């Protein structure tokens, strides 16, 4: 066999040319303790706060405690199969969630992974879950209304786009029902809705999703679910993940509504996590930064300036109280962060007043700025009328003789209370609200028996739809009641009353 030296030389030369010298450096550490979804890792000297760490079995964790000799982190998945001595790698990234148009209509978990059985979500963009809230210069005043479709709220506690309005009350008082009705009412209004379920039963979340599908509200809604069976870290990041998804649309100039249901369970999850991380407990065993936990989340709700596209993120956080105690630690924290609260009372709920809104304690700090002029015209005296009625009603129960004016105030109050009742999943268009509140506040329903008020309301709105559609259209278009329109509306009410009372 004849070996040519040139051939050997050329082979060696080509091999040398192809040789690539690569050194891959990995910053890794060792697990020294693991349990209850919390791990302590030795090493990782360059680790960032909130950094994503890679554990064995494709499980990730979030670094929260950066201590002198170890890093305390919370697992964002199952700790099964992970043991002390395993290697942990840094990723150099913070926790991110997928964002984009394709997430609309889907049910996802805290990490943005689909859990509705409809396959993977094709989206290329991601966004960090923890982001700094928009600054003062980047915002503008809240003045555009976000209609909830609930008469009592739109008339007395109006919500504006970019506002943070707390829904607070005991369990089973209709807090989630108000949030659901508000989402359903955004149909056709070009508002993207996000519902974040924190620590809820999976059956409850399934029921909510089914209702959203039945009312076609899922077409513009994202559901982020961190159910009660999920670990505390996943419940902790759920609202931030939902907020990041909403901010993506807000930055594109769109209007977004986000519901956090509920932040009481969120605080409990954070408390469990903090105690396991051995952070010092404070009042009610919550950590010292529990106020910051919610303030940094709710401050991300904003109405951006026109220069930045004019998008908005409206937040409806929900807080569950115990025996109506709004002076507890978490309720007072969130009340002080938000721009007002809708307070729901158990007594009102069981007396048949639904939604069970206590108009005396409930308030919107944006107020009339977030109302159309027509609503201001008809609902201006509503809160005072109801306050006078409540005061007189408590006085009248002692059987005192009342003068004519007091009796009239009582009768009007009874009718206003009936008018403000509303069944669930039946949000009302703003022009219909204006028409029925016009009839109530201007004393046109004083001769209708109290027990027939709801029947009167339903038939009156049907009558207006059939015979005087132009009145509703004008209110919707011009958003103000002119003298001419007021006369038309008055005549239509008198016309209908004759028919209604004859039939009755």
Swiss-Prot record:
Subcellular location: Cell membrane
Residues carrying the site annotation Required for activity: 362
Keywords for this protein: ATP synthesis, ATP-binding, Cell membrane, CF(1), Hydrogen ion transport, Ion transport, Membrane, Nucleotide-binding, Translocase, Transport
Main localization, broad class: membrane
SUPFAM superfamilies in the record: C-terminal domain of alpha and beta subunits of F1 ATP synthase, N-terminal domain of alpha and beta subunits of F1 ATP synthase, P-loop containing nucleoside triphosphate hydrolases
Enzyme Commission designation: 7.1.2.2
NCBIfam families: atpA, PRK13343.1
Protein name per UniProt: ATP synthase subunit alpha
Species of the source: Clostridium kluyveri (strain ATCC 8527 / DSM 555 / NBRC 12016 / NCIMB 10680 / K1)
Gene behind this protein: atpA
């Amino acid at each position: 066999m004849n070996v040519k030296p040139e051939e050997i030389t050329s082979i060696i030369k080509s091999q040398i040319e192809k040789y690539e010298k690569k050194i891959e450096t990995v910053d890794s550490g060792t697990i020294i303790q693991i349990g209850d979804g919390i791990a302590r890792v030795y090493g990782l000297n360059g680790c960032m706060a909130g950094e994503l760490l890679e554990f064995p079995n494709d499980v990730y964790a979030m670094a929260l405690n950066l201590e002198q000799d170890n890093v305390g982190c919370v697992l964002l998945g199952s700790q099964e199969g992970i043991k002390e001595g395993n290697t942990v790698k840094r990723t150099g990234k913070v926790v991110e969630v997928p964002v984009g148009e394709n997430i609309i209509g889907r049910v996802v978990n805290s990490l943005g992974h689909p859990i509705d059985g409809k396959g993977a979500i094709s989206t290329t963009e991601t966004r960090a879950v923890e982001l700094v809230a928009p600054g003062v210069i980047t915002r503008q005043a809240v003045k555009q209304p976000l209609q909830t479709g609930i008469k009592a709220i739109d008339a007395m506690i109006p919500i504006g786009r970019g506002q943070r309005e707390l829904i607070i009350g005991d369990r089973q008082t209709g807090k989630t029902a108000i949030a659901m009705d508000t989402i359903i009412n955004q149909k056709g209004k070009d508002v993207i809705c996000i519902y974040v379920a924190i620590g809820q039963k999976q059956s409850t979340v399934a029921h909510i999703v089914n209702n959203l599908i039945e009312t076609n509200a899922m077409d513009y809604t994202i559901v982020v679910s961190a159910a009660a069976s999920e670990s505390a870290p996943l419940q902790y990041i759920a609202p931030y993940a939902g907020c990041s998804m909403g901010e993506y649309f807000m930055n594109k100039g769109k209007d977004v509504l986000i519901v956090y249901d509920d932040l009481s369970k969120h605080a409990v999850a954070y408390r469990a996590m903090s105690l396991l991380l051995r952070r010092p407990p404070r009042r009610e065993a919550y950590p010292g930064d529990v106020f910051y936990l919610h303030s940094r989340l709710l401050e991300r709700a904003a109405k951006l300036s026109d220069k930045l596209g004019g998008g908005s993120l409206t937040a409806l956080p929900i807080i569950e109280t115990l025996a109506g105690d709004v002076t507890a630690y978490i309720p007072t924290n969130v009340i002080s962060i938000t721009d007002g609260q809708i307070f729901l009372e158990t007594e009102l709920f069981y007396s048949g007043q639904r939604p069970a809104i206590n108009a005396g304690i409930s308030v919107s700090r944006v107020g009339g700025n977030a109302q159309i002029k027509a609503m201001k015209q008809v609902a201006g005296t509503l809160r005072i009328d109801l306050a006078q009625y409540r005061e007189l009603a408590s006085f009248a129960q002692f059987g005192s003789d009342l003068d004519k004016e007091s009796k009239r105030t009582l009768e009007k109050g009874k009718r206003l209370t009936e008018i403000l009742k509303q069944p669930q999943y039946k949000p009302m268009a703003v022009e219909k609200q204006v028409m029925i509140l016009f009839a109530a506040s201007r004393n046109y329903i004083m001769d209708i028996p109290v027990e027939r008020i709801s029947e009167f309301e339903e038939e009156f709105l049907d009558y207006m739809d059939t015979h005087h559609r132009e009145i509703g259209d004008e209110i919707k278009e011009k958003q103000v009641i002119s003298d001419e329109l007021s006369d038309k509306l008055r005549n239509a009410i008198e016309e209908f009353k004759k028919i209604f009372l004859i039939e009755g």
